[in-house]
Design a protein with these regions (language model features):
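The feature marks helicase ATPase cores and/or their adjacent C-terminal helical subdomains
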Residues: 1-504
């Protein structure tokens, strides 16, 4: 089609129909549910060309996703079109950008924060573990529309807190919220900078500036309810493009009943062979939409089944089930003389995860309190290695890592891993499948743990894994390595019961 700016845009029939409907109804809200590879970013650029210059506010979750989006949509309203969620919140609050962690005074640490708030621990959790629990409470609160903290913001505990302990955690969390509000320089250190800024803007009653007529959000499955609350206060038309199957954990923020909806299932990136892998996942999920995924007939992604012991080729992106799985693959690849490197954003996080695991396994040699920035949030509910074992006893990658720790793997070994040193050459990248949404890579490998044959806890855990596998499969542009057929994997789990029943 030729856009109002006299530019030629090549569109699929489904995209063309949606754009024509949009142009005829510019004052109507719209939500597009589009599977991976349907060209959502390209479509978004076309929609923006139908609006007056400067009238569209484009939002994306992270700077990485915004940069990728800018490259895909082209020069629609300038090369710097759009804002990240945190940049938008800063604009509304008229706040300067919080200082990066490496620019903060050196005396700032989570230990110092715990002491400042006089957090002394809850139940058998030490000071730093209790602080991490409070941070999880604040994360849940910041994502919500709620105005006050309550027990519904508590994270899941394998052993539920007593009512007294729950009140103590909420009181600590309330104190932490008040302290962070007065000291925004801490935002980056506690790793909640974007959500804290958005929640502050929401609680302050902020609205989208009136100069914007439309708000467009890419990857809207990342949209927190608190940000939706801000947008809904204004009079702008809201256009969201997302994929519910790329929201593995947490709730997908739904739009109101009066919102025009459109589904696009035809993928311009993936072929029929990927279609045969993705549709069994869609059909098996217990609650999400069942519109079949349709691969392009003129596109072909090579799907390869790899044997046990296979090493991914140079430049491949390994998508793992968990941080335990990432740790396992990094150690295995290092033993083979290869570097498996976490993404830049994940490297510090994974190193902290590994250091915390080692410290809990060897408390006579290491202390979690000596870890810079404190123990990893994944361990906030554990005060001993036995508790870690109990929570992960069905995770094969965890059992493999535990065996390595029993053989003597320590912090010095961790620091010498090629993947943690950032060595390049014949290296590959590793990341968690759930965190790869919205990205695309030339060559992708799914780990065996991602397609585990062990029983899942319940239907909810299986649903979450189905979404993670969907994300992983749909990231590949040219070649995809899988350990076995996805339809057979689904059939295997259909033939066995879950470990537990969900619900009442």
């Amino acid at each position: 089609m030729i856009t109002p700016r006299h530019r030629e845009r090549w569109l699929s029939p489904a995209q063309d129909k949606l754009v024509r409907t949009f142009r005829a109804n510019l004052d109507e809200d719209l939500h597009v549910q589009g599977y991976a590879g349907i060209g959502k970013s390209h479509l978004l650029g076309t929609l923006m060309e139908c609006l007056r210059p400067g009238g569209a506010l484009l939002l994306a979750h992270t700077s990485g996703k915004l940069e990728a989006l800018r490259k895909r949509i082209g020069d629609v309203h300038g090369s710097k079109a759009g804002l990240t969620f945190i940049e938008f919140a800063q604009l509304l609050l008229n706040d300067p950008k919080p200082k990066p962690v490496n620019e903060l005074p050196k005396f700032l640490s989570k230990r110092a924060l715990s002491q400042e708030l006089n957090i002394i621990g809850v139940r058998d959790y030490d000071t730093q573990s209790t602080l991490n629990i409070c941070l999880k409470v604040l994360k849940n609160y910041c994502r919500s529309r709620d105005y006050t903290l309550s027990t519904k913001h508590l994270p899941y505990f394998n052993q539920p807190l007593s009512s007294m302990d729950a009140r103590v955690v909420l009181e600590y969390s309330s104190q932490l919220w008040g302290y962070l509000e007065s000291n925004p320089a801490w935002y980056g250190l506690v790793e909640l900078d974007a959500l804290l800024m958005i929640k502050r803007a929401s609680l302050s009653g902020c609205v989208v500036p009136a100069r914007y007529s439309h708000v467009l959000i890419d990857e809207s499955q990342d949209l927190p309810a608190s940000l939706m609350q801000i947008i809904e206060r204004g009079r702008q038309v809201l256009i969201t493009l997302g994929d519910e199957y790329q929201q593995a954990g947490g709730a997908f923020v739904s739009r109101g009943r009066g919102v025009r909806r459109s589904e696009i299932a035809y993928s311009v990136r993936s072929g029929r062979n990927v279609e045969s892998l993705v549709n069994p996942l869609i059909y098996r999920h217990s609650s999400k939409g069942k519109t079949p995924f349709e691969g392009a007939s003129n596109t072909d992604i090579a799907v390869k089944y790899y044997p046990q012991g296979f090493l991914p080729p140079e430049g491949c992106v390994v998508l793992a089930a968990s941080r335990w799985d990432m740790m396992k693959w990094i150690i295995q690849m290092d033993a083979a003389g290869r570097a498996l490197i976490p993404s830049t954003e994940a490297q510090k996080d994974l190193k902290r995860f590994m250091a915390t695991a080692i410290a809990l396994f060897k408390p006579d040699f290491y202390s979690v309190e000596q870890i810079p920035d404190g123990p990893h949030l994944d361990f906030s509910e554990f005060s001993s290695w036995q508790q870690v074992c109990d929570a992960n006893r069905y995770d094969e990658s965890f059992l493999w890592v535990e065996a390595e720790l029993e053989k003597g793997f320590n912090v010095a070994d961790m620091n010498q891993l090629k993947g943690m040193l950032g060595q390049s050459g014949n290296s590959c990248m590793v990341m968690m499948a759930e965190q790869a949404g919205g990205m695309e890579f030339d060559v992708v490998l799914l780990t065996p743990q991602l397609l585990t044959v062990n029983k899942f806890r319940d239907v909810n855990e299986f649903d979450q894994r189905i979404c993670a596998v969907y994300i992983a499969i749909s990231r590949a542009k040219f070649k995809l390595y899988v350990p076995y057929d996805v339809a057979e994997w689904i059939a295997h789990h259909d033939s066995q019961k879950f470990r537990e029943f969900s619900g009442y």
